[in-house]
């Protein structure tokens, strides 16, 4: 009996620990189910989502299972829901809907049958599953161009969770709302989240906050700071590789590719190719298409990856998202108007109310050179006077507020 309990506990660790992959789980779960059915084992509860708005990319990455989602739904639904208890209420239906969503399917019909189960999830299940369903609904609404409906879905869910004291979910809900701001080009609102709630500590990475780190990198890209975005993403590299986080790796590689592209670093090609190869292996579409207008120019320059059918579907969905959200991750200052390092230094001095002569002395350049740079800066910022340049620079986050 003690041996069975020990084996059962080890199996539970395989099922519950987020750093353990899903290889072998299809065999482990029925074995644990048998022990539970025979009342030879009891298991503690655990979060299947890690407080994230996703089942497929929550406590574990279930990309491998997505390849056989129909078969696994039929054969694993009963044992999975039995093993997980409260955590399993609504899980199977939500999981297959999300799997199909990632593959580019219109899941509005599936959501119509899933949403009525929310009351059951609320009564018999867990808030983790409730957030997963709400998050999937919001994502499907965004994919259909219904950004106002998506915001209402998440704002309403957040208010309910706050009222019930479910505070551990709020940081990821706020990050999701920030992504909606970015989709709609509401950069001031996104910046408010960034300064008040983003982790912003690359020296002390917490992988449980990975959804927030990815959101943080998106804000940095929108603020025209690809270098900052790369610094935010870099600490996640080892985690997504060592823990087989395929979906997270696609997001990380796409965002890194966008940052490199904007830095005119040709290494973006390798990063985007990695993302495409992973997505194509699982037939995922929306994992990449969600980046719409931000990733479209890169895809147009890159040779095709994956089958012709998959690539055609991907490009169609990317263009659809680009049409719905034309300002997503677009920097405040157009790429063609990006300031050179020298111009940025001179802009800081202009905003500090230094004269051209003082700037020439500080930078050790000729006065005529300063005047030329200042003229270029005014043109790029679309202003005529130095005082206007100061206001524009602050609005574009090119200089600190105290200057």
Give a label for each model feature:
Residues 30-34, 268-283, 319:
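TPR/TPR-like (Sel1-like) alpha-helical repeat modules
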Residues 14, 18-19, 100-101, 141, ...:
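Residue at a conserved register position within TPR or TPR-like alpha-solenoid repeats
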Residues 228-251, 325-332:
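Generic long, charged, amphipathic alpha-helical segments
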